[in-house]
């Protein structure tokens, strides 16, 4: 820089300090009132040591004396040239004055202090490992070292050095500097050599030397004032701050690496070796969790094994792959075959003693043929009055006792079409089927369906012809109709027992009971009692007071209160209590006994199997295994055709939230809704569940624009108010038929009507009155049918339709009319501006007719 700014500070005799911003090229005028004896008061500052090569060493004392003499001459002078000095000259003279002052202090030092300094320097030298460039304060010293380089102390060179020159600088106090300089002037060359050797090392620490100086000052009784930090120049401060920041960053990095190494070493040292249980199938996520390892690490090992990049968390691994991965992470494993576990559970007790059990009888037939009434007559109960409109909506299980010790278990299934799946499940747990046929109605669709279920399940069947008391009852007609479906009665030479009964008049009920016991004896029904219990879920629901309630049929073993059961792939729990069909408490349940169980964590699906396990841990393992099997089956399903998805999205939807009292009702309603199909509209069941309507159901309906269908469940007042605020419709039903009928009506209202063109007449053009931009005015004759204002017109020329439009105006003479029939002339305004040929052009008249579509 040619020009730089600096601040010159002079301490006047009055004690005030005047500061002026000047340039290096400016001249300074020195006041003549300054006495010769006055010395410039300088703030002590830290100076830099610059290593320069020179041929000889300047005598510091002579330079100081000559500088002082020059200053005195300049101060005494009165001319303008003598009193005008540049800033650089003034700074040099101030340095000379300071050096002279330092020389006076050096002379005051005693030989004892020199000896002490020598001892201090020798002790520090022993600790120094590396040489360093040294900064000495306030003295222009030139100290020779063993090398060709010489150290020059210059207090004004801080602006001439770069950052690199300051990296190896050590700050020393002025007192140490003066003592070192004085020690260099001693005749004894040994001390000078020691100082020179000291300066060759870069390991001298300023703090240690400062400590030695402080101790020396305390011994002298004249402690030196410690320089304040504000005496540093701006450049030196900046360099020091940068160096401190860099050292701090290095220390932070060093601490971080040291901590990381400690953590790594500790983690490796304290890594736990786990024993991993490996089933037949396990996902990547599950394997990583069982090892407590990161998923990406497991994926990396899999990539090395298979070379596949697209490894998902839900991908399944077989036991061989999983075991290799476990060993790669230094864990141990144990193969667990959950399929074997389940097989062992169900095979337990196969070789035990078989004991006779009660028959399980399922009553099936068409709706309203008297199935529940017949059971009421047999049980001497009145269940049918509890059913809405006398139609059974739920599957029921009961047990009756005959002749003191003979027991029969009855399962009552709903008869209408919606419960086809329930009837199918009923045949899986039954031993004997009682097919109820009304004597007046005969064979109905659900009767035929029940016959097919019996044949598929290969179970014994008894036909009970009910309502035999009616005048139009015809038993022979019923037996002949059954023959057409492969059911041969004993009267016709077959093996199927046909019993005419009347539930209302209680006719032949004992004969029906005896027939059931006879077939049961022929079947020799037996089961193992002394083993873990297993069976089938007949029905399940949520009770607001007791929680989940499941109706079970025990098929094997003995179920006790306190047992842990697993039902299906989602429900398990400890049996808290059990009740029979009459509401009585039970402690144990033996084979063929229907029982209501409390204590499951979830609502199991009806028709699923249950089994008792040893612990809740084993129950969870079995649940997870069954869910994995389900996921594997779902993953094997073919990909959905994207073109079908686009078509599917174009279909209108009716969103439905379904809440029912029991799981069987949900399955029945979903089955019936699934049979409602149409190419332009469909029903989307967003959510289905067991229990009363809740606020969450209302909020979901609001979000999804759905209707809520409630079957045999209640809605409390708060939920009703919320639904009213949100304008959500809640429909309550007690018969499944009503739900299906309402859904069909709603879908019918959502369907857009079909528009069809129906030809209603024909016109022949007699005369063209005008043709313009506003249309053509034509004189026409109605040859057939009629013409209506606004009707669709198709202009035909040579059997080609050249124009389609509407009749804007229809007149008869000068009067506007709505229609003109055949055999009359009329005038029309047609929205067609091109040429029309009366001889060859014909106009066909059409009417748009909308056809209302109905969901059947």
UniProtKB/Swiss-Prot annotation:
- Supply one GO molecular-function term: GTP binding
UniProt-listed InterPro entries: EF-G-like_DII, IF2_II, IF2_N, P-loop_NTPase, Small_GTP-bd, T_Tr_GTP-bd_dom, TF_IF2_bacterial-like, TIF_IF2
Tell me, in one coarse class, where this protein mainly resides: cytoplasm
Q: Where in the cell is it found?
A: Cytoplasm
Q: What is this protein called?
A: Translation initiation factor IF-2
The UniProt entry, under PANTHER family, shows: TR-TYPE G DOMAIN-CONTAINING PROTEIN, TRANSLATION INITIATION FACTOR IF-2-RELATED
Using the UniProt annotation, give all residue ranges assigned to the region (G3).
Answer: 412-415
Q: Which portions of the sequence form the region G2? A: 390-394
Region ranges (G4)? 466-469
Q: Which residues bind GTP?
A: 365-372, 412-416, 466-469
Q: Where is this region: G1?
A: 365-372
> What is stated as this protein's family in its record?
Belongs to the TRAFAC class translation factor GTPase superfamily. Classic translation factor GTPase family. IF-2 subfamily.
């Amino acid at each position: 820089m040619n020009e730089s700014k600096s601040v010159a500070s002079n301490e006047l005799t009055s004690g005030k300090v005047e500061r002026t911003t000047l340039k290096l090229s400016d001249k300074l005028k020195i006041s003549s009132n300054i006495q010769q004896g006055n010395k410039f008061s300088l703030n002590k500052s830290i100076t830099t040591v610059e290593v320069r090569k020179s041929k000889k060493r300047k005598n510091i004392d002579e330079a100081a004396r000559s500088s002082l003499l020059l200053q005195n001459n300049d101060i005494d002078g009165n001319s303008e040239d003598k009193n005008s000095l540049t800033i650089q000259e003034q700074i040099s003279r101030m340095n000379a004055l300071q050096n002279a002052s330092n020389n006076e202090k050096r002379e005051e030092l005693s030989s004892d202090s020199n000896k002490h300094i020598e001892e201090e320097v020798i002790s520090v030298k022993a600790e120094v490992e590396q040489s360093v460039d040294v900064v000495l304060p306030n003295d222009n010293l030139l100290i020779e070292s063993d090398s060709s380089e010489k150290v020059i102390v210059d207090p004004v060179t801080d602006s001439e050095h770069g950052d690199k020159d300051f990296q190896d600088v050590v700050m020393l106090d002025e007192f140490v500097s003066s003592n070192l300089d004085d020690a260099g002037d001693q005749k004894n060359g040994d001390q000078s050599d020691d100082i020179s050797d000291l300066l060759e090392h870069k390991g001298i620490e300023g703090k240690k030397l400062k400590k030695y100086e402080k101790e020396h000052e305390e011994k002298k009784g004249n402690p030196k004032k410690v320089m304040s930090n504000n005496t540093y120049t701006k450049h030196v401060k900046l360099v020091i701050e940068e160096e401190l920041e860099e050292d701090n960053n290095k220390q932070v990095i060093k601490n971080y690496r040291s901590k990381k190494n400690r953590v790594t070493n500790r983690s490796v040292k304290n890594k736990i070796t786990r024993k991993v249980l490996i089933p037949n199938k396990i996902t990547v996520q599950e394997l990583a969790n069982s090892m407590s390892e990161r998923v990406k690490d497991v994926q990396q090992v899999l990539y090395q094994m298979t070379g596949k990049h697209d490894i998902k968390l839900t991908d399944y691994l077989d036991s061989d792959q999983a075991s290799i991965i476990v060993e790669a992470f230094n864990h141990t494993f144990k193969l667990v075959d959950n399929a074997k576990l389940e097989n062992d559970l169900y095979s337990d007790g196969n070789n035990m003693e078989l004991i006779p059990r009660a028959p399980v009888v399922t009553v099936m037939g068409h709706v309203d043929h008297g199935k529940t009434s017949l059971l009421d007559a047999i049980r001497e109960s009145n269940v049918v009055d509890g059913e809405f409109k006398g139609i059974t909506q739920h599957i029921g299980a009961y047990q009756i006792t005959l002749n003191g010790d003979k027991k029969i278990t009855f399962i009552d299934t709903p008869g209408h079409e919606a419960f086809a799946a329930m009837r199918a499940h009923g045949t899986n747990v039954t031993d004997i089927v009682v097919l109820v046929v009304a004597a007046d109605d005969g064979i109905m669709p659900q009767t035929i369906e029940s016959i097919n279920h019996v044949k598929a399940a290969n179970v014994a069947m008894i036909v009970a012809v009910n309502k035999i008391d009616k005048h139009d009852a015809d038993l022979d007609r019923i037996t002949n109709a059954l023959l057409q479906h492969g059911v041969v009665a004993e009267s016709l030479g077959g093996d199927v027992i046909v019993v005419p009964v009347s539930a209302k008049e209680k006719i032949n009920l004992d004969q029906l009971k005896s027939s059931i016991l006879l077939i049961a004896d022929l079947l020799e029904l037996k089961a193992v009692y002394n083993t873990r219990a297993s069976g089938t879920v007949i029905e399940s629901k949520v009770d607001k007071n007791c929680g989940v309630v499941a109706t079970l049929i025990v098929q094997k073993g003995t179920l006790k209160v306190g047992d842990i059961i697993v039902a299906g792939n989602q429900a398990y729990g400890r049996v808290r209590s059990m009740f029979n069909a009459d509401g009585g408490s039970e402690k144990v349940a033996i084979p063929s006994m229907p029982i209501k169980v409390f204590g499951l964590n979830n609502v199991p699906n009806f028709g699923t199997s249950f089994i008792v396990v040893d612990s809740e841990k084993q129950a969870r393992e079995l649940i997870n295994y069954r869910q994995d099997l389900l996921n594997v089956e779902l993953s094997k399903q073919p990909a959905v055709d994207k073109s079908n998805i686009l078509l599917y999205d174009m279909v209108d939807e009716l969103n439905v939230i379904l809440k029912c009292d029991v799981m069987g009702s949900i399955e029945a309603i979903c089955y019936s809704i699934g049979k409602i199909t149409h190419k332009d509209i469909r029903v989307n069941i967003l959510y289905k569940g067991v229990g009363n309507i809740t606020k969450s159901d209302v909020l979901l309906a609001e979000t999804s624009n759905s209707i809520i269908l409630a079957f045999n469940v209640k809605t409390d007042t708060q939920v009703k108010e919320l639904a009213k605020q949100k304008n959500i419709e809640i429909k309550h039903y007690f018969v499944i038929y009503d739900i299906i009928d309402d859904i069909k009506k709603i879908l019918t209202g959502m369907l857009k009507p079909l528009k069809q063109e129906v030809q209603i007449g024909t016109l022949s053009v007699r005369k063209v009155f005008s043709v313009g931009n506003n249309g053509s005015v034509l004189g026409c004759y109605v040859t057939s049918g009629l013409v209506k204002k606004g009707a669709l017109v198709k202009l035909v020329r040579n059997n080609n339709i050249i124009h389609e439009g509407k009749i804007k105006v229809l007149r008869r003479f000068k009067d506007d009319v709505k229609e003109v029939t055949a055999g009359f002339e009329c005038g029309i305004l047609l929205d067609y501006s091109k040429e029309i040929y009366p001889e060859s052009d014909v106009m066909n008249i059409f009417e748009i007719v909308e056809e209302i579509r109905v969901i059947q």
